[in-house]
């Protein structure tokens, strides 16, 4: 059957804070916090107040006693001198003392100025959190901050709310092209499968009528943090010690990495002609003394570009011949790529300097660009005994009632920063097509901003006239305790 990988429509005038969605619940102040492992995304239901993004980290500068956070942490002159602490482990808040420091900073910012006791709180957490962690969270929210009420949910549910509301509003606008059949299905279907690939881990979360099917949620421990750390290890092994350059390596990962559509083919291509491969990218490392080069940049190499067009055709011919001779075997036939062995055998990371740019440090990346994010599909490449993205989706769907399988395959939504790798949607569709029943349609969708969609969904939800009936008031918590909260939310 047919398959589709689509980007949701972006309508002129249909921003996340479009005035038409602020119609009902503006009298009750609501604070929305999408509490991610990498950043906090914070907004209120006041349409005139912008949202903010705050690093969910506290930094300490070498040889200094004071801590830094927020903008000071982002803009610190030499990030390699900063040691950061994160209040979360594997996606769950385990250090509420540290998390509270970050919240306090965010609430006191000039663009927020939040008094918690005047607000109702809408907060996200990772699915299937532990009761002990939730108990501490309730104590912080109700007893220390004294929020008027709490509504606890997941980023996946809020992202789904935003996407459906966005499609509905698009459909209602005049002079817009009509939605295609797959978009209409996404809007009207009661079944959706959300892939939330974030900083700490990846969750596969099926929904029925906007409600999570907790028994079918699947998780594997590959996220943006692990991918960045893996890239750090590869580069540090091959040339420079980058183990204290987490921020820089995260930036390089985001700017240079992609998902290969044919991993074996690209591995072979990178081995045949390392220096002149079209896969090669030269990244100029930052000079922290230069205000114009704080993050580094991709260097244009005109000589390589001119030579690559002719050489690439020859390489492709040679590789196809190798395929015919069974030198390249498919993964289905049993070939396993041992990335750790490959790292030791093949040092493709080099430095390049010219007389004109003798002060530049240039990091050349070839197969690192796609072997790192390949872990999303094959965690076993680094010895993790976990299913990858496509297999986890199939396992999650198979846990649900068989009547839900067709609509779940037809309405897959990608959320989270780690879904932004170029080629991920296309590769996922190819992998699912191999695993799913032939008669099923596979449709994969991604919002324009998969990182902020949950926050926008929270804003929309907070505007509903019946929002407060889904939350638990401070009075109810004080009367019935945290077990009552768990029963109502979960």
UniProtKB/Swiss-Prot annotation:
Keyword Cytoplasm in annotation: yes
GO CC annotation: cytoplasm; cytoskeleton; Swr1 complex
Principal subcellular localisation of the protein: cytoplasm
Gene Ontology molecular function terms on file: nucleosome binding
Keywords tagged on the record: Cytoplasm, Cytoskeleton
Cellular compartments annotated: Cytoplasm, Cytoskeleton
Domain of life where this protein originates: Eukaryota
PANTHER family documented for this protein: ACTIN
Family: Belongs to the actin family. ARP6 subfamily.
Protein name in UniProt: Actin-related protein 6
Originating organism: Dictyostelium discoideum (Social amoeba)
């Amino acid at each position: 059957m047919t398959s589709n990988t689509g980007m949701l429509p972006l309508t002129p005038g249909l921003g996340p804070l479009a005035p038409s969605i602020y119609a009902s619940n503006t009298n009750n102040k609501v604070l929305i916090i999408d509490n991610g492992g990498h950043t906090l995304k914070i907004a209120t239901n006041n349409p005139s107040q912008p949202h903010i993004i705050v690093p969910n980290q506290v930094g300490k500068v070498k040889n200094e006693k004071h801590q830094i956070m927020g903008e000071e942490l982002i803009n610190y002159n030499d990030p390699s001198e900063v040691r950061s602490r994160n209040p979360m482990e594997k996606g769950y808040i385990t250090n509420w003392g540290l998390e509270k420091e970050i919240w306090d900073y965010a609430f006191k910012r000039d663009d927020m100025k939040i008094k918690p006791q005047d607000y109702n709180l809408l907060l996200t957490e990772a699915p299937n959190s532990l009761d002990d962690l939730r108990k501490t969270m309730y104590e912080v929210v109700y007893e220390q901050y004294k929020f008027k009420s709490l509504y606890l949910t997941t980023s996946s549910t809020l992202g789904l709310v935003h996407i459906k509301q966005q499609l509905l509003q698009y459909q209602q606008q005049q002079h817009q092209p009509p939605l295609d059949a797959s978009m209409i299905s996404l809007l009207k279907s009661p079944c959706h499968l959300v892939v939330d690939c974030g900083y700490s881990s990846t969750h596969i979360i099926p929904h029925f009528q906007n409600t999570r099917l907790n028994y079918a949620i699947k998780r594997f421990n590959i996220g943006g943090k692990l991918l960045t750390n893996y890239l750090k290890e590869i580069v540090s092994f091959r040339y420079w010690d980058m183990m204290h350059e987490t921020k820089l390596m995260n930036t390089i990962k985001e700017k240079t990495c992609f998902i290969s559509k044919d991993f074996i083919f690209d591995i072979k291509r990178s081995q045949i002609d390392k220096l002149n491969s079209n896969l090669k990218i030269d990244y100029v490392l930052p000079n922290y003394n230069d205000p114009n080069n704080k993050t580094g940049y991709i260097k244009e190499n005109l000589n390589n570009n001119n030579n690559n067009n002719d050489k690439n055709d020859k390489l492709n011919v040679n590789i196809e011949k190798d395929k015919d001779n069974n030198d390249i075997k498919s993964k289905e036939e049993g070939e396993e790529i041992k990335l750790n062995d490959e790292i030791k055998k093949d040092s493709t990371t080099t430095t390049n300097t010219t007389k004109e740019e003798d002060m530049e440090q240039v990091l050349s990346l070839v197969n690192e660009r796609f072997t790192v994010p390949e872990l999303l599909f094959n965690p076993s490449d680094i010895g993790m005994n976990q299913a990858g993205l496509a297999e986890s989706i199939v396992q999650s769907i198979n846990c649900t009632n068989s009547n839900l399988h067709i609509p779940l395959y037809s309405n897959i939504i990608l959320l989270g920063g780690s879904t932004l790798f170029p080629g991920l949607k296309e590769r996922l569709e190819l992998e699912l097509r191999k695993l799913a029943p032939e008669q099923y349609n596979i449709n994969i969708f991604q919002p324009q901003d998969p990182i902020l969609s949950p926050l926008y969904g929270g804003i929309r939800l907070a505007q509903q006239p019946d929002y407060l009936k889904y939350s638990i008031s401070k009075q109810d918590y004080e009367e019935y305790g945290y077990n009552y909260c768990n029963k109502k939310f979960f």
